[in-house]
Amino acid sequence: MVSMLVYACADLKTALDELPTFLNHSTDIEKHLVKVQSYESDCDRIYIDAAHALYADKDADPQAVRLSHALLDTVEEAMDSVENAAERVQALIAQSV
Protein backbone atom coordinates (compact mmCIF):
# COMPACT_ATOMS: atom_id res chain seq x y z
CA MET A 1 0.00 0.00 0.00
CA VAL A 2 2.78 2.40 0.86
CA SER A 3 4.51 1.92 -2.49
CA MET A 4 1.20 2.63 -4.25
CA LEU A 5 0.87 5.80 -2.19
CA VAL A 6 4.36 6.85 -3.29
CA TYR A 7 3.53 6.15 -6.96
CA ALA A 8 0.24 8.04 -6.66
CA CYS A 9 2.04 11.03 -5.16
CA ALA A 10 4.58 10.95 -7.98
CA ASP A 11 1.82 10.91 -10.61
CA LEU A 12 -0.01 13.74 -8.87
CA LYS A 13 3.22 15.76 -8.76
CA THR A 14 3.82 15.14 -12.47
CA ALA A 15 0.28 16.28 -13.27
CA LEU A 16 0.72 19.40 -11.15
CA ASP A 17 4.06 20.14 -12.81
CA GLU A 18 2.35 20.01 -16.22
CA LEU A 19 -0.62 22.13 -15.16
CA PRO A 20 0.89 25.54 -16.08
CA THR A 21 1.37 24.40 -19.70
CA PHE A 22 -1.98 22.63 -19.98
CA LEU A 23 -3.79 25.41 -21.84
CA ASN A 24 -0.91 25.97 -24.27
CA HIS A 25 -0.60 22.45 -25.61
CA SER A 26 -1.59 18.86 -24.98
CA THR A 27 -0.10 17.17 -21.95
CA ASP A 28 -0.45 13.86 -20.17
CA ILE A 29 -2.11 15.36 -17.10
CA GLU A 30 -5.27 13.28 -17.42
CA LYS A 31 -3.25 10.07 -17.78
CA HIS A 32 -1.46 10.77 -14.50
CA LEU A 33 -4.68 11.67 -12.70
CA VAL A 34 -6.35 8.45 -13.88
CA LYS A 35 -3.34 6.49 -12.59
CA VAL A 36 -3.82 8.13 -9.18
CA GLN A 37 -7.43 6.90 -9.14
CA SER A 38 -6.30 3.43 -10.17
CA TYR A 39 -3.76 3.29 -7.35
CA GLU A 40 -6.44 4.40 -4.90
CA SER A 41 -8.83 1.67 -6.06
CA ASP A 42 -6.10 -0.96 -5.75
CA CYS A 43 -5.21 0.38 -2.31
CA ASP A 44 -8.86 0.07 -1.22
CA ARG A 45 -8.89 -3.61 -2.19
CA ILE A 46 -5.62 -4.29 -0.38
CA TYR A 47 -6.87 -2.41 2.69
CA ILE A 48 -10.01 -4.54 2.90
CA ASP A 49 -8.10 -7.80 2.40
CA ALA A 50 -5.45 -6.81 4.95
CA ALA A 51 -8.03 -5.75 7.54
CA HIS A 52 -9.88 -9.05 7.13
CA ALA A 53 -6.62 -10.97 7.48
CA LEU A 54 -5.73 -9.07 10.65
CA TYR A 55 -8.93 -10.09 12.38
CA ALA A 56 -9.02 -13.63 10.96
CA ASP A 57 -5.98 -14.65 13.01
CA LYS A 58 -7.53 -15.56 16.37
CA ASP A 59 -4.09 -16.07 17.93
CA ALA A 60 -2.83 -12.59 17.04
CA ASP A 61 -1.81 -10.21 19.78
CA PRO A 62 -4.72 -7.73 20.18
CA GLN A 63 -2.37 -4.79 20.64
CA ALA A 64 -0.48 -5.71 17.45
CA VAL A 65 -3.78 -6.00 15.58
CA ARG A 66 -4.89 -2.54 16.76
CA LEU A 67 -1.55 -1.02 15.80
CA SER A 68 -1.54 -2.70 12.39
CA HIS A 69 -5.10 -1.58 11.73
CA ALA A 70 -4.21 1.98 12.72
CA LEU A 71 -1.30 1.91 10.28
CA LEU A 72 -3.55 0.58 7.52
CA ASP A 73 -6.06 3.34 8.28
CA THR A 74 -3.35 6.00 8.09
CA VAL A 75 -2.08 4.85 4.71
CA GLU A 76 -5.64 4.51 3.37
CA GLU A 77 -6.52 8.03 4.55
CA ALA A 78 -3.37 9.41 2.93
CA MET A 79 -4.26 7.69 -0.35
CA ASP A 80 -7.79 9.11 -0.16
CA SER A 81 -6.29 12.58 0.26
CA VAL A 82 -4.09 12.14 -2.81
CA GLU A 83 -7.12 10.99 -4.82
CA ASN A 84 -9.09 13.99 -3.55
CA ALA A 85 -6.32 16.31 -4.77
CA ALA A 86 -6.31 14.59 -8.17
CA GLU A 87 -10.09 15.02 -8.42
CA ARG A 88 -9.72 18.74 -7.65
CA VAL A 89 -7.13 19.09 -10.41
CA GLN A 90 -9.52 17.33 -12.80
CA ALA A 91 -12.27 19.78 -11.81
CA LEU A 92 -9.96 22.73 -12.48
CA ILE A 93 -9.11 21.33 -15.89
CA ALA A 94 -12.78 20.79 -16.70
CA GLN A 95 -13.54 24.42 -15.81
CA SER A 96 -10.69 25.64 -18.02
CA VAL A 97 -11.77 23.80 -21.15
Set out the residue ranges of the language-model regions.
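Cytosolic, long alpha-helical scaffolding segments
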Residues: 1-97
